[in-house]
Regions:
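Beta-strand C-termini and the immediately following turn/loop, strongest in propeller blades
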Residues: 168-170, 223
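Extracellular loop and loop/strand-boundary signature of outer-membrane beta-barrel proteins
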Residues: 1, 6-8, 40-50, 92-102, ...
Length: 240
């Protein structure tokens, strides 16, 4: 069973200047194993093992306009909740293949700040910083009992992101438009979730930290309503 919903509410505190946005995103996945072929091969009955995972991200964002609307700021706070429960079994050699009861939950706090400043009618600058998390998905934490092992000890992936960019956007007529955008970014990632190989199986594990930084740029020219030309380039480097 896979159940999910997303609720979003927006309220204008000051018309055309300040608004607050509240969002709640929830997902619950449960599964009951039933594989008679595998049970006969392993000479054990593992059918009926139930496990579930749920994750919820709640956020509140405050958007404000300053200096006659030339500067826009968005400040966001986030709460992450993660829960894992049920029975799992480790089928990898030399595991004992005995079902184990697992119940764990974690919560995290994140935030972000985004700024956009209109330099002129065609040019703008933007900046963003973010401290966020990525919660483990069902297949990452609980596997599939076929090719991917369970990984109930898996932690949420944590990232600190920084971005600085500039953008040009101009219409020359109703169908002709020129756009240019360039960004520089830094990403610091901790507890990265990687799919690794374990004795004939695969398993998701947290593998340390990484630093990723780079720049990218893109130019797009809409010649008319039927034709356009674009070019983009990216340079990046990662350090483990």
């Amino acid at each position: 069973m896979d159940y999910r919903y997303n609720l979003n509410l927006q309220y204008h505190l000051i018309p055309d200047r300040m608004l607050v946005n509240m969002n709640n995103d929830f997902r619950y996945v449960s599964n009951e194993t039933r594989d008679t072929v595998a049970d006969r091969f392993l000479k054990k009955d593992y059918s009926g093992l139930k496990s579930n995972i749920s994750g919820m991200i709640s956020s509140v964002a405050l958007q404000n306009k300053w200096f006659q609307g030339r500067l826009t700021s968005v400040l966001t706070g986030r709460h992450y909740y993660y829960r894992l429960g049920g029975k799992t079994v480790n089928l990898a050699y030399p595991g004992d293949a005995v079902p184990a009861e697992t119940h764990k939950s974690d919560q995290y706090w994140g935030y972000s700040l985004a700024l956009k400043y209109d330099l002129s009618s065609h040019w703008l600058m933007k900046f963003a910083l973010e401290h966020n998390f990525r919660l483990p998905r069902y297949e990452e934490a609980l596997g599939d009992r076929v090719t991917t092992l369970t990984s109930t000890e898996l932690k949420a992936e944590q990232a600190n992101n920084y971005n600085l960019g500039i953008m040009f956007d101009r219409y020359y007529n109703a169908n002709s438009r020129l756009q240019f955008e360039s960004n520089g970014y830094i990403m610091q990632v901790k507890n990265m979730m990687y799919l690794t190989s374990v004795v004939g199986y695969s398993k998701y594990q947290n593998l340390g930290e990484a630093l990723l930084y780079g720049v990218d740029g893109e130019i797009k020219w809409d010649i008319d309503r039927n034709w356009f030309v674009s070019f983009n380039a990216t340079w990046q480097k990662s350090l483990d």
